[in-house]
């Protein structure tokens, strides 16, 4: 018999019907009876879904560097600068620490949005990430970044105020979305499925007043040799898997989103990115710290 293994990407929106996801494979099977078309994921996924010691060492290093870069960017972001200048600050720290970019660092305005933040194509998303918007007074700034160490990438998001403190409305949205993030991370353990985690987020965002309407993507993905790692997104989680848990909402033009890297352990989980400020008091305290990258250097390039 002739066997054809097809490596069909598994990273997709969890709400998308599986019949659409694997339509290509079904067409191959219908085209000829001479081929036994099988999913290459059955062979490859177990090798990549569970991190060995080498993978964990490099993922932890990537997370540490990403945290350092993000915290510097979170300190720097303010009305005197543009999103590109803040982005370059994050990337500078990555390179200073010997890391590559797992993907193009995204720094964008998260206030006064008139539509959901989503793109039809990868090219559109990359173009948006490379934008250069002026940060305004009272705005929120959103970060999405991941350093890469020895081909292993982190993937982390944070949202911060451009000023010293969140406004009351920003605080309201932030606290709501943060509660969802904590609940989903708290539910991570062996035996739970991605779909169950996704439904926790959708249900809680809906209960907040229909906030789930702007949540147009899945709850997360594996990380490893690829930022959006291949794997089994249907079966139960296993110890040793490293996940990126992400969700957020756009409420009256204000966007808050988080993404955290989480290790599935034998007894539950370990929140690997917890050291990066996420509580409101911690974020505001970080905003009061002096950045290592001097603002004069950035302002000179305006």
Q: Where are each of the predicted segments found?
A:
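Active-site neighborhoods and metal-handling regions in enzymes and metal-associated proteins
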Residues: 1-302
